[in-house]
């Protein structure tokens, strides 16, 4: 049959060829659209059958054994921004650990202190002011928390009333665990008291047994004769809840042999050198706090 145009007149050869190409193009486009819809439907069915079931946030972090990006990974050192803030949002909140530390105020008065893992500095500042220390250095691995602590100190100094003494408080960003044990050889005594409150778990999970043992030895070396290490270790039960923060932390957790109930024996051993340990007290916290023993280790 001859091809005709809209006026039912026969088409010329070129016109017929052009029309045929146009029809072929339209048919091809229609076929592609149909094929595209079919593929999308198949993909949708595959996705529906392969999608994992609903899971808790903790389980979603490790689908197929691989850690997913999660905001908790930013806090793998325990550097929670509101670690103390959650406890002081209520102005009536009182950190009961201050009462335990206050049973021996002479340990702090006119002394030079180091607070390892000071977070945003709330407790450090309260200790410095309440017990009239000579100076206090707060150290934390999170630069943002240190910036917050420095701002708090600056605010206190600006708003201090005449005659209101503000102790010399300095906050420093850094990792207390050294890159190499050989650096311990250059340590010199410079503090009367070192505070390590609820920090051992995070050192342990990130730097293994060797990192925590090195930190203990460094604490001893930085204390003057007769100096005190005030230690508030976390129990090993609390480690398990954080082991999924990253694959490295999980591997470190599985490799731990040096348990918290071994800390005292190690600190009193010749490898470290502390002369004695005494229990300072166990805080009786409200439910938003902690109830961990606070120990005092004395350097002979």
Swiss-Prot record:
Domain Bin3-type SAM, residue spans: 95-300
Top class in the EC scheme: transferase
Family to which this protein belongs: Belongs to the methyltransferase superfamily.
Main localization of the protein described in the UniProt heading: nucleus
Biased composition regions of type Basic and acidic residues, renumbered to the chain: 34-44
Name recorded for this polypeptide: U6 snRNA methylphosphate capping enzyme Amus
Annotated phenotype, changing residue 83 to F: Unable to rescue early lethality phenotype of mutant flies
Record EC number: 2.1.1.-
Keywords of the record: Methyltransferase, Nucleus, S-adenosyl-L-methionine, Transferase
GO MF, one annotated term: snRNA binding
Annotated knockout phenotype: Embryonic or larval lethal. Conditional knockdown in ovary leads to female sterility, possibly caused by dysregulation of miRNAs and mRNAsso.
Residues that hold S-adenosyl-L-methionine according to the record: 119, 140
Any one GO CC term of the record: nucleus
Region feature Disordered, mapped onto this chain: 1-21, 34-68
Annotated PANTHER family: 7SK SNRNA METHYLPHOSPHATE CAPPING ENZYME, BICOID-INTERACTING PROTEIN RELATED
Biased composition (Polar residues): 1-12
Function, as annotated: Probable S-adenosyl-L-methionine-dependent methyltransferase that binds and stabilizes U6 snRNA, probably by adding a methylphosphate cap at its 5'-end. Required for U6 stability, but not stability of 7SK snRNAs, other miRNAs or tRNAs. U6 stabilization is required for efficient pre-mRNA splicing. Essential for organismal and germline development.
Cellular compartments annotated: Nucleus
């Amino acid at each position: 049959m001859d091809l005709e145009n809209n006026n039912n007149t026969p088409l010329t050869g070129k016109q017929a060829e052009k029309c045929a190409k146009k029809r072929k193009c339209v048919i091809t486009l229609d076929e592609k659209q149909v094929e595209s819809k079919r593929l999308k439907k198949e993909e949708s069915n595959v996705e529906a059958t392969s999608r994992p079931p609903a899971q808790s946030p903790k389980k979603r972090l490790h689908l197929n054994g691989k850690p997913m990006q999660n905001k908790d990974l930013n806090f793998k050192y325990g550097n929670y921004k509101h670690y103390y803030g959650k406890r002081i949002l209520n102005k009536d909140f009182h950190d009961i650990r201050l009462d335990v530390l206050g049973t021996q105020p002479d340990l702090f008065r006119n002394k030079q202190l180091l607070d390892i893992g000071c977070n945003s500095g709330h407790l450090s500042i309260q200790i410095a002011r309440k017990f009239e220390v000579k100076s206090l250095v707060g150290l934390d691995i999170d630069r943002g928390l240190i910036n917050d602590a420095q701002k708090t100190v600056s605010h206190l100094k600006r708003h201090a009333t005449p005659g209101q003494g503000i102790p010399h408080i300095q906050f420093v960003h850094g990792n207390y665990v050294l890159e190499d044990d050989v650096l311990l050889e250059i340590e010199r005594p410079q503090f009367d008291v070192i505070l390590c409150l609820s920090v051992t778990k995070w050192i342990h999970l990130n730097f293994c047994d060797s990192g925590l043992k090195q930190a203990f030895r460094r604490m001893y070396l930085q204390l003057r004769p007769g100096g005190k290490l005030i230690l508030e270790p976390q129990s090993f039960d609390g480690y398990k809840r954080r082991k999924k923060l990253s694959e490295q932390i999980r591997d470190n957790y599985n490799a731990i042999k040096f348990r918290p109930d071994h800390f005292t024996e190690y600190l009193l051993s010749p490898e470290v050198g502390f002369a004695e340990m005494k229990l300072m007290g166990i805080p009786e916290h409200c439910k938003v706090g902690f109830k961990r023993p606070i120990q005092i280790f004395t350097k002979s």
